[in-house]
């Protein structure tokens, strides 16, 4: 088991410090042939239980000052990032890493939320339509760094979906065919979703035909019909029942269904299929490492060894030809 790409997150309010942290990592990655994807995680630092430790920005938007924002990030922090600053910060990042082939992708916003007052898709409202943000920011990035991939996450939608085809807790891309992200440079767009078992996501069923049908409707059709690539920007599970309310059986069902789907084994249920050396749907495991006291989904134990349950799932992924 191994990996060839690392996803690292940054915050608008701490961008200068984040770039200082990233630079030596990018240099080390270049020496080892590992690629980097940078993701904007939240606008503000300083998270706690009130906003699930910053797992997502609770106002559901990509900015927290002006526009549709109430002047906070929705999690108790005063807002400092306007829509304009959000774009400017991404252009700063793009310029900083222009000319290196190690930083290959920019994940424009981590886990936007399709909550009331949060992100929408295809509404045409520049204050909330995240598709329009992806176009504005993506094209501004490509103007200074045309080689990089622009990664556009579907808003996590627990209530329904933009196309009215059922909830999309992993990310709602149900309108991405009818209302696509339009970039000025071809072949640079990658859509993305995040998928976790119920003890993390709260989404049920964990797997099986109903889960497959929901994925087909909300993002899988993009791959099945060759419309656009989709990347699973985060996935992972603990598999031992030691964290929060994990049910190990549910996590195993989740993993079986998702891995089969990503590998093209569920074509008889409408999922993507792949032939011969074709690559399956690419993924990013959260997290590759060990955090003392926070072994939510990490792949390593305290000794640095791969945890068997994670390895058993990870090694099945059809990640390369």
Where are these regions (language model features)?
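Non-catalytic accessory regions flanking glycosidase/transglycosidase catalytic cores in CAZymes
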Residues: 1-5, 20, 31, 35, ...
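Conserved Rossmann-like nucleotide-binding pocket used by diverse enzymes
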Residues: 36, 231, 284
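Generic structural signal for helix capping and beta-alpha/helix-loop junctions
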Residues: 15, 46, 158-160, 239-240, ...
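An active-site-proximal structural segment forming one wall of the substrate-binding cleft
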Residues: 1-6, 10, 14-108, 129-142
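Extracellular glycoside hydrolase catalytic/binding regions
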Residues: 87-91, 95-105, 109-279, 301, ...
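Short acidic/His/Gly/Ser-rich catalytic and metal-binding motifs that mark active-site loops
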Residues: 44-56, 115-117, 200-201, 293-294
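Catalytic domains of carbohydrate-active enzymes, especially glycoside hydrolases
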Residues: 1-11, 37, 217-225, 275-282
């Amino acid at each position: 088991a191994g990996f060839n790409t690392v996803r690292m997150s940054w915050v608008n309010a701490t961008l200068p410090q984040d770039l200082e942290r990233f630079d030596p990592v990018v240099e080390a990655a270049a020496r080892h042939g590992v690629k980097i994807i940078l993701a904007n995680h939240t606008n503000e630092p300083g998270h706690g239980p009130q906003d699930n430790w910053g797992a997502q920005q609770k106002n559901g938007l990509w900015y927290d000052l002006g526009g549709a924002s109430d002047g906070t990030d929705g999690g108790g922090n005063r807002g400092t990032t306007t829509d304009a600053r959000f774009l400017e910060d991404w252009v700063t990042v793009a310029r900083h890493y222009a000319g290196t082939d190690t930083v290959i992708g920019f994940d424009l916003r981590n886990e936007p939320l399709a909550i009331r007052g949060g992100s929408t898709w295809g509404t045409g409202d520049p204050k909330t339509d995240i598709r329009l943000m992806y176009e504005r920011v993506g094209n501004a990035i490509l103007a200074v760094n045309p080689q990089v991939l622009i990664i556009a996450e579907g808003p996590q939608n627990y209530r329904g979906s933009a196309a009215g085809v059922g909830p999309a807790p992993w990310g709602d891309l149900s309108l991405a065919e009818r209302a696509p992200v339009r970039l000025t440079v071809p072949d640079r767009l990658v859509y993305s979703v995040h998928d976790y078992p119920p003890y993390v996501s709260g989404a049920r069923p964990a797997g099986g035909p109903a889960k497959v049908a929901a994925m087909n409707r909300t993002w899988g059709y993009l791959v099945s019909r060759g419309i656009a690539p989709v990347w699973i920007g985060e996935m992972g599970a603990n598999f031992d029942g030691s964290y929060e309310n994990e049910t190990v059986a549910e996590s195993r069902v989740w993993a079986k269904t998702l891995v089969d789907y990503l590998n093209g084994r569920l074509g008889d249920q409408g999922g993507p299929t792949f032939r011969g050396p074709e690559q399956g749907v690419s993924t990013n495991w959260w997290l590759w490492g060990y955090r003392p006291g926070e072994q939510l989904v990490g792949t390593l134990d305290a000794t640095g060894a791969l945890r068997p349950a994670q390895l058993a799932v990870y090694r099945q992924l059809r990640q390369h030809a």
